[in-house]
Design a protein with these regions (language model features):
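Alpha-helical transmembrane segments
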Residues: 1-142
Length: 142
């Protein structure tokens, strides 16, 4: 992996996410045969991470949701890996590989079922459950 040259931070990530959302909405309108839930599946991690972090900070921690923190799912995974491996760069690589591979595995069935609204709706719920379960399990270990 090349060393990172760009750092977006939370606000930059939110801005980039907004651009992606606009693109997805336009694509969804142009292709009505594809279930809107399919797009939810494709973008689930990106958007749910934002909403989950926003409400976690605002409601649970009672602080500004615009303040950065290290309690995102990928940061929890990174911290867990650092406990076993002190090499920060390798731990960062492993987090990227793990999250992208897991996400790809979860998305593949949706690609083949993108026109089946019922499947995509319930599959979105599975994503939600997996995210919450993973987050709670990792946050309890730290």
């Amino acid at each position: 992996f090349p060393k990172a040259k760009i750092f977006l931070g939370d606000s930059g990530s939110y801005l980039l996410g907004s651009f992606i959302a606009i693109t997805v909405i336009k694509t969804s309108i142009a292709n009505p045969e594809i279930s809107p839930f399919y797009f939810c599946i494709i973008l689930f991690y990106l958007f749910f991470e934002v909403f989950f972090s926003f409400f976690r900070k605002l409601i649970k921690e009672k602080k500004s949701p615009m303040l950065p923190d290290e309690k995102h799912l990928h940061m929890l995974l990174y911290k867990m890996l650092l406990k076993k491996n002190t090499d920060k760069i390798k731990s960062n690589y492993y987090v990227s590989i793990f999250i992208n591979t897991a996400y790809l595995i979860l998305i593949i069935p949706a690609i083949f079922m993108m026109e089946n609204g019922e499947f995509c709706k319930y599959y979105s719920l599975i994503f939600f459950i997996i995210y919450i379960f993973s987050y709670k399990k990792m946050s309890n270990k730290l």
